[in-house]
Amino acid sequence: MKIIALWASTSQQSINKALATYAAHLVEGGRVEVLDLNDFELPLYSEDREKTMGQLAAATQFIDKLKEADAIIVSLAEHNGTYTAAFKNLLDWASRVSREVYQHKPVVFLATSPGPGGAASVLDVAVQSAPFFSANVKGSLSIPSFYDHFDASTQRLTNSHIHSQLEA
């Protein structure tokens, strides 16, 4: 089973990168590929740009990567209560290649933040919009106060309750 894990941030030190990678490796027998949002850099989407530039290679490559997956894990960073600009822009361009961005594949949405909110707002946005992008949502989990529950030196969750929720 091939698992595609994506952290929806451009930060190389993203806590959502750590969470997506950790969660993907919990799938027994899974082959994991972690996608870097920076590999799909695109100009700001607009209809005018789409008319002049057409479908861009990075958006097509993103759709093609998701086609390879048997399951997808997306860990969402929250900026001002919603998606990061880079992730929203990628969704906008990718949805022009194929409205069915997630291609009816099983998707788990995760979100975390350093604070007690756990990026719950962006998680709600993702789950609510998932049907529009043809995601077969199998679960979602917000993890508040990430640094209180994750050991950076071992790259492991230290909270057994949260770990159990992820495994489910």
Predicted regions and their residues:
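N-terminal beta1-alpha1-beta2 submodule of the flavodoxin-like/Rossmannoid cofactor-binding fold
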Residues: 1-92, 96, 153-168
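Short glycine- and Lys/Arg-enriched binding-loop motifs that mark or flank ligand-binding interfaces
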Residues: 4, 77, 100, 111-114
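Amphipathic alpha-helical interaction elements
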Residues: 8-12, 99, 115, 135
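Residue-level detector of flexible, active-site-proximal loop/helix-junction positions
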Residues: 10, 39-41, 114, 144-147
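Phenylalanine-focused residue identity feature
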Residues: 40, 62, 87, 109, ...
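A glycine- and small-aliphatic-rich helix-loop capping segment at beta-alpha/alpha-beta transitions
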Residues: 89-99, 127-132
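Short, glycine-/small-residue-rich phosphate/pyrophosphate-handling segment
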Residues: 103-145
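A charged, well-structured terminal subsegment
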Residues: 130-168
